[in-house]
């Protein structure tokens, strides 16, 4: 794979996937680390370890299967840790990470998760993905309210470029946005320090009570809110890869990196959609290049873990929101079409879409999981009724 031979839109898709992933949740990771009692140096080490783990897993799986397999930390899992790690020592937190990732590996080895994912209808997977991504589209246009000049200009340039050179529309929007941000003086880079940071090994401390109260919920949240949507998103995009090996590999890698602060590495859904979209590459079989590029950017982000938070703080939130919305627009539209195309499955797909988009959280598990459950129940009930009426 030669970077110079990869089309610019494909390079941009890989870059945006990493940028949006970090921008949307890096702060939550830092907050969870602070709750665990980590020092600034240790937190930087966590970010380094996470970047390296995601980079290695993304590159390995993508190059091996030649499909866009993007991995990511579990944002819902990080949010759970913000409250779950309160009262625990840093060593106990590391013990929780190890138990969680060991459970993920066990789940992958048994094949239970793969069998579950095979029975999910394509329309429900697409509806869930559309529900996950909807907020990014809404945030993009809501950002016009506070930053009309910046976001309005990005939108107009995107529209004009989309009409004449569709593959370069997001690039053009990003460039004009950067120009306006610099012109307005909205970039503050004083906190950005580009210096490689080595991860710090932390001795784990295991507790049965903490395994039940924190590790088990973290395992469930990671599988239900990260891996399930990630596999379903890949399925909705028309890609197939053996589920169990994906889960086992990411779980094992996270297990190895756990003593350095990696609490989980799962299959990405939101950011993966950028690499799986037509904007990444018109040829569906070449979109794996975008994920491979994302893997390289993950590694770079890992090498400079201490600079990540400063970089995210330097960019206006509205710029990131508009860029994310524009990059995901085609994927949202395509997912909605796939979800609603089959009239017999339409009602169940709408339920899955709305529950997922609602942001519902029950027993610490996010709306993507409950969207699949609600849509699945509707699918089974409505199809049973339809079959009974037919006979």
From Swiss-Prot:
Residues 31-42, 115-123, 189-200, 268-287, 333-361 are periplasmic. GO terms for cellular component: plasma membrane. Residues 1-9, 64-93, 145-167, 222-246, 309-311, 383-391 are cytoplasmic. Its main location: membrane. InterPro entries: Benzoate_Transporter. It is a multi-pass membrane protein. This is Inner membrane protein YdcO. GO terms for molecular function: benzoate transmembrane transporter activity. The chain crosses the membrane at residues 10-30, 43-63, 94-114, 124-144, 168-188, 201-221, 247-267, 288-308, 312-332, 362-382. NCBIfam families: benE. Disulfide bonds: none annotated. It is found in: Cell inner membrane. Keywords: Cell inner membrane, Cell membrane, Membrane, Transmembrane, Transmembrane helix. The lineage of its organism: Bacteria, Pseudomonadati, Pseudomonadota, Gammaproteobacteria, Enterobacterales.
